[in-house]
Structures are given as structure tokens and as C-alpha cells.
């Protein structure tokens, strides 16, 4: 039996709600069909936004939504997406499927979506093919509440008042699709562009994100972090869980135990990535002025047969749920540096939380993990430690069988989320909570065979259910977690 220790007296950091953020790019059917169907659609909508999707995302507790990319961001010119629909310029989405982008979803539509969701805005600016002036004028258009050419243009297009822009990223993947730059060059470009990302509203600082590394590119982090503290508020990190390699990633649904173990073990490398990049940031920014922003993460498998390869459509199983659960626990544990994270992507793309097909909608296992974990948002991370006698391994790496995190809310309620990522082994734990006499304990579980999924023929196969494999103790609990499971424990003291 493994020992699980929780110490509510050890208050570490606030778990930012934005760790549970999402990302929607102009890619495949994420925006179009997935979220935006237009006002004239027969699918129920409010101002073009699918009512079912908006409701589901609100129920899940979506705190922030990144847009318009991704690689798309560095070929997106915002003025093409404003004004009358009939006058908007069409373009070819060269990164994603070579389809025509009609720009019917632009800045105004994005902020209407943000309004309906009740979440914060995270806009990604164009450094790769844009200009300083273009970026400056976009920020002015979105946020200035005075008399100026851009503010007047916004009013002409129907928005009398500016919007609140919480986050703004200066470029995306500038080491790759955003310009193939090196770290030193990008850092100088960031400083130049960032100068003109102005705070137009008193008391409303726009949080600036600098382009950070791709996965294990520690040199990039060092180069950029030598130049951006005092200028940037955050540094991005991108890491995708690819079971094999980019030419042969593996199927999203047809996989064996070896494939499963490789996936969850490689997902756990996020712990190493966050730790090592944070070490560099701590050395160059000991005041912690710059946060870590993991604004692209998740599983990336081969696309579903018969779909456009550029649309990145993949189904979602309990394996994906395990990746989501263990990763969110890692982010929670590093809440002192990780301010925001954005899973890729919200609807119909990669590790989506929602799938749509016509007027039908499916909530994926990943969706249910996010909804389970939403109680952690804005809680205080507390000290916790779980022993692990077993590991899940692949040739390159390994992961502990269980990954956990614990938090406490302002009322003293403790939330502990524990993931058993083994597909074959159950796990017994005995939890002791320091200086706590347990009054009530409730728990819920998401579990199933590693292949279990929700699809349009069986949308409710994977569901969160009450967990009866737990027994309350005076100072904690004893529980037995089945294979491939995530459990949330909610503890109140006397």
C-alpha cells in the first residue's frame, strides 16, 4: 500500500485558473463547424456560436481561450477579418489543409465568443509575416477607448467600447513556422514589437507572452531569458506527446499496451521539461518576473482514416484522459511558475475536449478530466507526496504509476486528484492529512479500459461516476484505484 501525505499547513502558491486554458486555431473544423456556424445556421446558435458547445465549455469551467493560432497566427492579418462579411478578404490556409479561409470569424466574432464563454482573451500576434505597425494597430483597435483611427474603425464596425485583452503573445513558434529564427534574433525582435504593444487602459495591463522553446530546446530559453525579463510577463513552451515520431505517430484508437505505455511515459516528460526550463528561468530571473506559459500541449496521433491530413482530427480515448490528468497535476505542482497552459485544441482538433458532427456533439474523456479538475482553479497548492513502488516505462523514459496534486480553497476544503496511469495494475493508497480531523469525504472517478471512448454512436460510454472504493479515516482515507483511472477526493475537516 502506497503512502499519500497531504499537508494543508504548507501553502505553496495559487493555482492559476488559466492553467486550465484552451486553444482554438483556424485549423480543420475547430473554429468553423466546431464553434462557429454562422447566424443563419440551422444548428442552434447565438450570434453564430454553437449553443451546445458554448454551454459545454462554460460547464467545464473554461478560463481563457487562445486565438487565432498557432502557425496560422503568423500568416493572419487582422484587418482581413473585420468589417462586412461580403467585403472580407479570402486567403489560403497554407499550413492546414490548403483550404480557403473566408475570414468570417475575426476579431469581433472572437470577442463575442469570449463574452458568451465568460472567459479571458488570449490573442496571438503576427511577427512572422506581419509588422510592428500592424500589431500596434490591432492592440489599439481592441483596447483603446478614445478617439483614434483604430478606435474609430472599431466603432464603425459595431463595437463602441473596447474589449478587455488579458493576454497577448508576440509571435508563435518563431523557431519554426513563425519565422525560423534563432533565440537571440527573436529576443531582439520581441523587444522591438513589444514596445508598441501598449496598455491603453489605465489599470488593465496586457500580459505579454514571449515565444519560448520547442520541447527540449534549452538553449532557446537561455537566449531569450537573457533579454526579455522586464519586458515579457510570460515565456511560452510547446510540447506534444507523440508516441513514436512525426512520420509515424501511432493511431489514436488502435493501439496496444506498448503504445499506451509509451504515450503516458512520454507525456510525463512534461515534468522534466517544466523543471529544467524553470531552472534556467530561475537562474536568469530570480525575481520570477517571467512566468512559464505552456500554451500548446496534448497528444498528437495520426489523423483518422478518410479525413483531411491537414485537419488533425483524432478521436479521444481513456489514454488521452490519463495524459490530461497527469499533465494537469504536473502544472498544479509547478504553480509557482506556470501561470497558464492551453491544451491543443478545443474542438475537433488533436486532443479535443469536444467533437462535433453536424448538429451532434460529443464530450470526450479529456473533457471530463478538465471538468473534474476545475475545483483546483484559484485554489492554493498545498504540500503533498505520494510514494510509488511501480512505474510505467518505455525505451526512452518512465513515469511513476501515480501522479497527484492537492489544493485547498478559501473555505478550507481540500481537493486531491490522483491518477493511476497503469493500464493493468490497480493501486492502493493510504492518505494521511496533517493536523486534520476528517468530517466528510466524497470522491468521484473517471475510469475504463484504455481503449474506451465517447463517439457519435456511443457518446456516454466514458463518464464521471461516484467512487465507492474509498474508506474515510479520522485523519485521511484508504482507497483502491483501478487501472487507468483518475480520482478526485474532496475532504472537509471538523
What are these regions (language model features)?
Residues 1-234, 270-303, 307-494:
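Non-catalytic accessory regions flanking glycosidase/transglycosidase catalytic cores in CAZymes
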Residues 240-261, 307:
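Active-site His/acidic residue clusters
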Residues 265-266:
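Beta-strand-rich domain onsets/edges
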Amino acid at each position: 500500500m502506497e503512502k499519500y501525505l497531504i499537508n494543508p499547513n504548507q501553502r505553496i502558491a495559487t493555482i492559476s485558473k488559466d492553467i486550465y486554458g484552451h486553444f482554438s486555431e483556424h485549423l480543420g473544423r475547430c473554429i468553423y463547424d466546431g464553434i462557429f456556424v454562422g447566424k443563419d445556421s440551422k444548428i442552434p446558435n447565438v450570434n453564430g456560436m454553437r449553443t451546445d458547445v458554448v454551454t459545454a465549455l462554460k460547464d467545464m469551467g473554461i478560463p481563457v481561450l487562445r486565438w487565432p493560432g498557432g502557425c496560422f497566427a503568423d500568416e493572419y492579418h487582422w484587418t482581413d477579418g473585420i468589417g462586412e462579411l461580403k467585403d472580407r478578404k479570402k486567403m489560403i490556409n497554407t499550413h492546414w489543409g490548403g483550404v480557403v479561409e473566408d475570414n468570417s470569424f475575426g476579431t469581433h466574432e472572437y470577442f463575442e465568443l469570449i463574452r458568451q464563454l465568460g472567459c479571458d482573451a488570449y490573442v496571438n500576434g503576427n511577427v512572422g509575416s506581419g509588422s510592428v505597425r500592424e500589431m500596434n494597430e490591432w492592440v489599439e483597435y481592441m483596447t483603446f477607448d478614445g478617439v483614434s483611427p483604430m478606435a474609430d474603425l472599431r466603432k464603425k464596425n459595431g463595437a463602441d467600447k473596447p474589449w478587455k485583452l488579458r493576454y497577448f503573445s508576440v509571435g508563435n513558434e518563431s523557431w519554426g513556422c513563425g519565422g525560423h529564427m534563432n533565440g537571440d534574433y527573436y529576443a531582439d525582435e520581441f523587444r522591438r514589437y513589444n514596445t508598441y504593444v501598449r496598455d491603453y487602459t489605465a489599470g488593465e495591463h496586457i500580459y505579454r507572452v514571449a515565444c519560448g522553446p520547442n520541447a527540449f530546446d534549452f538553449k532557446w530559453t537561455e537566449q531569450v531569458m537573457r533579454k526579455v525579463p522586464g519586458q515579457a510577463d510570460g515565456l511560452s513552451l510547446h510540447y506534444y506527446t507523440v508516441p513514436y515520431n512525426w512520420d509515424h505517430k501511432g493511431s489514436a484508437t488502435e493501439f496496444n499496451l506498448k503504445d499506451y505505455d509509451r504515450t503516458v511515459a512520454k507525456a510525463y516528460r512534461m515534468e522534466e521539461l517544466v523543471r529544467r526550463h524553470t531552472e534556467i528561468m530561475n537562474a536568469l530571473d530570480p525575481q520570477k518576473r517571467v512566468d512559464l506559459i505552456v500554451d500548446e500541449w496534448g497528444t498528437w496521433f495520426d489523423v483518422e482514416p478518410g479525413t483531411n491530413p491537414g485537419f488533425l482530427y483524432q478521436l479521444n480515448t481513456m489514454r488521452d484522459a490519463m495524459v490530461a490528468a497527469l499533465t494537469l497535476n504536473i502544472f498544479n505542482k509547478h504553480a509557482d511558475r506556470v501561470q497558464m497552459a492551453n491544451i491543443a485544441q478545443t474542438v475537433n482538433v488533436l486532443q479535443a475536449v469536444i467533437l462535433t458532427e453536424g448538429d451532434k456533439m460529443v464530450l470526450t474523456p479529456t473533457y471530463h478530466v478538465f471538468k473534474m479538475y476545475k475545483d483546483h482553479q484559484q485554489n492554493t497548492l498545498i504540500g503533498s507526496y505520494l510514494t510509488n513502488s511501480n512505474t510505467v516505462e518505455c525505451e526512452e523514459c518512465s513515469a511513476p504509476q501515480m501522479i497527484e496534486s492537492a489544493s485547498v480553497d478559501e473555505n478550507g476544503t481540500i481537493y486531491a486528484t490522483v491518477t493511476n496511469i497503469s493500464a493493468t495494475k490497480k493501486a492502493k493508497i493510504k492518505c494521511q492529512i496533517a493536523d486534520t480531523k476528517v468530517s466528510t469525504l466524497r470522491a468521484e472517478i473517471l475510469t475504463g479500459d484504455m481503449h474506451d471512448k465517447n463517439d457519435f454512436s456511443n457518446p456516454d460510454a466514458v463518464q464521471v461516476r461516484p467512487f465507492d472504493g474509498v474508506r474515510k479515516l479520522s485523519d485521511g482515507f484508504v482507497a483502491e484505484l483501478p487501472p487507468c483511472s483518475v480520482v478526485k477526493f474532496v475532504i472537509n475537516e471538523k
